[in-house]
């Protein structure tokens, strides 16, 4: 186990050292790939389990599609191709045979889902159709970091088609709201929510909605996105259905996704110089019971603990010598609560509870350790983690009027709020000048004719959030 680098000394190395010490991943054989170790994958499985409940509540059916797509199919949607072309992994040969039509290893699966919809949606009775796939996608990345930017990553991608334009658009809003709620409630991370500007929009979408989380180093992380695709893909792939009037109309389409990037957000948002800190609801081990191997495994004390922890995820560690090393290992793994049952506790008929968020110990009697106490403890833990990120986010937003104030705020690791009416070219110029990008804006916001863009001085501006981003 290597030493954990202090966050305040080198944030990037601190992040990597947390991943190494918590035993989450190893590097793969190909640049930019990672191998999930059991504990790292267990975290992703917990996220998957909990988010699946939300998908089911939205009448989403699960599917699994091939990862290979003919390049000729990819070429049908011009904006999609232009957006992804530099990032594509391609297969040019099958064995020794060179392919006339190369295969793309999916960077996303709109095209596969279009193929499904074309084959299976025949009439208005088949709509809406909402599908989800858990799998991996591939994108060529120059600068890679575990979870944050990898050439292959795991995610869920939901794709849906509707007969009604408003229903489709509203569903894309529903999905970004569900992502925000999930990240707030299950991952204890406060986020900005809004719509992407033209240049930041998903390739082929009419609208992209996003949630953005602020990290302690002042950079933001795009944490999940939802897209209203309109009829862009439907036109390219001839997605039509028979209406009640026996006409044939184009389908309206949406897509949305949450990836293993979110594990990077969890690590950076909550962890400290002592290791990983995990949100309670997605922790693979929520309670670690640490005791001596001299304690009878069928003791009344352990039975009482197990009874009160019914329904939670717990693991018991019977330690041969000092409990200290096991406690430290569990702390590095970010286990929310450790229940210590040493000689002193057994003699006094008490339990010592160690909280990962505050690093504080509390000694209570077995009588006090009941389900009501546990529920309150969990609520307090989750609220504490969320409140820290919410305070960080709210205190980091700064309004600016000009480019000098913009640069100063960036240097101070701020999220910038500013009036903007620039186009895609203006966004590129601003990024070249400052390395910052527009993150999102409130889609319900009305354009103010009296306000001018801080960068171009053009009228009809709206408030947009800017930041440096991962």
UniProtKB/Swiss-Prot annotation:
E.C. number: 6.1.1.15
Keywords, ordered alphabetically: Aminoacyl-tRNA synthetase, ATP-binding, Cytoplasm, Ligase, Nucleotide-binding, Protein biosynthesis
MF terms in GO: ATP binding; proline-tRNA ligase activity
Compartment(s): Cytoplasm
The UniProt record lists the keyword Aminoacyl-tRNA synthetase: yes
GO terms under cellular component: aminoacyl-tRNA synthetase multienzyme complex; cytoplasm
GO biological process, one term: prolyl-tRNA aminoacylation
PROSITE patterns: AA_TRNA_LIGASE_II
Any matching Pfam family: HGTP_anticodon
Catalysed conversion reaction: tRNA(Pro) + L-proline + ATP = L-prolyl-tRNA(Pro) + AMP + diphosphate
Keyword hit for Aminoacyl-tRNA synthetase: yes
Broadest EC class assigned to this enzyme: ligase
Transmembrane segments: none
Subunit structure: Homodimer.
HAMAP family: Pro_tRNA_synth_type3
PANTHER family, sorted: BIFUNCTIONAL GLUTAMATE_PROLINE--TRNA LIGASE, PROLYL-TRNA SYNTHETASE
Family: Belongs to the class-II aminoacyl-tRNA synthetase family. ProS type 3 subfamily.
Comment, domains: Consists of three domains: the N-terminal catalytic domain, the anticodon-binding domain and the C-terminal extension.
Function comment: Catalyzes the attachment of proline to tRNA(Pro) in a two-step reaction: proline is first activated by ATP to form Pro-AMP and then transferred to the acceptor end of tRNA(Pro).
NCBIfam families, per database record: proS_fam_I
Protein name, per record: Proline--tRNA ligase
């Amino acid at each position: 186990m290597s030493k954990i680098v202090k966050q305040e000394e080198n944030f990037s190395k601190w992040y990597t050292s947390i991943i190494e010490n918590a035993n989450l991943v190893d590097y793969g054989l190909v640049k930019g790939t990672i191998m999930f170790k059991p504990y790292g994958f267990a975290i992703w499985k917990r996220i998957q389990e909990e988010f699946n409940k939300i998908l089911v509540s939205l009448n989403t059916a699960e599917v699994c599609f091939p990862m290979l797509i003919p390049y000729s199919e990819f070429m049908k949607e011009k904006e999609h191709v232009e957006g992804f072309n530099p990032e594509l992994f391609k297969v040019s040969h099958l064995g020794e045979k060179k392919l006339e039509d190369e295969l793309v290893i999916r960077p996303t699966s709109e095209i596969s889902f279009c193929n499904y919809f074309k084959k299976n949606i025949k009439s208005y009775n088949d709509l809406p159709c909402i599908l989800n796939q858990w799998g991996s996608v591939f994108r060529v990345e120059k600068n890679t970091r575990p979870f944050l930017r990898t050439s292959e990553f795991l995610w869920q991608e939901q794709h849906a088609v509707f007969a009604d334009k408003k229903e489709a658009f509203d569903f894309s809003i529903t999905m970004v709201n569900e992502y925000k709620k999930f990240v707030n409630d299950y991952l204890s991370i406060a986020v900005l929510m809004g719509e992407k500007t033209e240049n930041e929009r998903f390739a082929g979408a009419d609208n992209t909605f996003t949630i953005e989380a602020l990290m302690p180093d002042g950079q933001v992380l795009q944490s999940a996105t939802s897209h209203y695709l309109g009829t862009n893909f439907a036109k390219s792939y001839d997605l039509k259905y028979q209406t009640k009037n026996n006409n044939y109309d184009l389908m309206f389409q949406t897509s949305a996704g949450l990836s293993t990037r979110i594990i990077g957000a969890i690590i950076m948002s909550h962890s400290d110089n002592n290791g990983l800190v995990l949100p309670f609801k997605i922790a693979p081990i929520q309670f670690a019971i640490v005791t001596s191997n001299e304690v009878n495994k069928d003791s009344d004390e352990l039975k009482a603990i197990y009874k009160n922890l019914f329904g939670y995820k717990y693991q018991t560690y019977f330690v041969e010598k000092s409990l200290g090393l096991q406690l430290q290992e569990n702390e590095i793994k970010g286990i929310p609560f450790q229940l210590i049952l040493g000689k002193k506790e057994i003699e006094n008929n008490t339990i010592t509870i160690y909280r990962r968020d505050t690093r504080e110990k509390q000694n209570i009697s077995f009588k006090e350790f009941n389900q009501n106490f546990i529920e309150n403890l969990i609520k307090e833990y989750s609220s504490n983690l969320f409140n820290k990120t919410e305070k960080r986010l709210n205190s980091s937003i700064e309004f600016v009027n000009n480019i000098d104030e913009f640069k100063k705020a960036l240097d101070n690791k701020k999220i910038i709020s500013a009036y903007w009416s620039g186009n895609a070219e203006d966004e590129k110029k601003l990024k070249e000048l400052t390395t910052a990008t527009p993150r999102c804006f409130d889609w319900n916001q009305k354009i103010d004719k009296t306000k001018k863009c801080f960068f171009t001085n053009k009228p009809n501006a709206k408030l947009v959030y800017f930041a440096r981003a991962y």
